[in-house]
Amino acid sequence: MPTVIHNRFAVSFDYPVHFTDNAFDPASDLLCGVFDRLGEKRVHRVAAFVDAGLAEARPGLEASIRAYAHAHADAFELTMEPLRIPGGCKAKNDVAIIQNIVFALGNLHMDRQSFVLAIGGGSMLDATGLAASLIHRGLRLVRMPSTVLAQCDAGVGVKNGIDHHGQKNFMGTFAPPFAVVNDVSLLTSLPPRERVGGLAEAVKVAVIRDGAFFARLETDAPALAAGEPAPLRRAIEDAAAIHLRQICTGGDPFEFGSARPLDFGHWAGHRLEILSGHAIAHGQGVAVGMALDTVYAKRAGLLPEADAARVLALIGALGLPRFLPELEMRRPDGELEVVRGIGDFREHLGGRLCITLPTAIGRTAEVHSMDEALIEAAIGELRTLNHKT
């Protein structure tokens, strides 16, 4: 007779997200506390990886890491010189980078109690985090995001992934970090386009979850577009808190179901990135994706026109795009190329298509199909808006 043994268990995860300034100041003991937050009272082994673009923009960073380790030799030791890892689209699209990180860590004989300290933008954190999650089924990962986008979103979450097979995040793992340290001093070398692009993720969580935060973004938009430090830090902290709240209380942190509220605007945004050969940055792609879904929701009768106008106005006020020519690219059969993003998104979700659309600022609904004629009309409206501005 067939038999079955049913099993059920729960695993609790917890990790802190710190906000600080100049974490590598030798007078600061924050990182020492991060490495020893379990109270193990020993010298921890740490392998540091640095985004190559960040290292080039901040020539003294690696020396600061070494000096900090020297000053706190009683708390941790660097197992190697900080190793530069390519950032941006290269990190997300080259499996060899993952292999290189794995080889470096393997040669150091890092164990499951050892630390990987990843300092960089979201793509570099994704690549390094993926590699760290594979070694011994998971080393302790401490992320130090160096972009607005990563400090708002990618750097504080529980996912790692790289692009492959023509799809965003085709290969990846769910692996919560040991800790996250959001150091605002790392943002000072960001080019304006990257700084502004990261604010798309703040707009995203405001639209789907928090009308009060959305209103603050509207008020602060001129200062945020200008890169003023205090409003920027406030927006990052608020966006990260909302993002983390969704992970912790949304009921599906590892995405076993089909709903993806934190992917508002991403089905089109990801496709635009692919269509542009990654010339379109993630933040800019998501901004246009949110604009498209906002107009679509309005035309579908889900979102009041006044709310749609506010969303589009905020995206524009922050200096983010609401239209890109790639929206109008077509396949040989005449189908819009961007529509293929719906199929990619469905495959990534698994099972039933589930796209988050706003029904009011701070509220959403899930839809299970998209009308291509409405998508075409929404793109036309965004093109007209783009010409007017």
Language model features by range: what are they?
Residues 216, 220-333:
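Active-site segments that bind and position negatively charged phosphate/pyrophosphate groups
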Residues 1-114:
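ATP/NTP phosphate-donor binding region
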Residues 108-131, 135-146:
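A short, small-residue-rich loop immediately preceding and capping a beta-strand
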Residues 86-88, 119-121, 264-265:
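Glycine-rich beta-strand-to-loop/alpha-helix junction loops that act as flexible
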Residues 2-3, 10-12, 200-203, 302-389:
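C-terminal charged capping/lid subdomain of soluble metabolic enzymes
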Residues 18, 130-223:
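A glycine/threonine-rich phosphate-anchoring loop and its flanking beta-alpha core
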Residues 70, 106, 176-179, 185-192, ...:
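Generic secondary-structure signature for well-ordered alpha-helical cores
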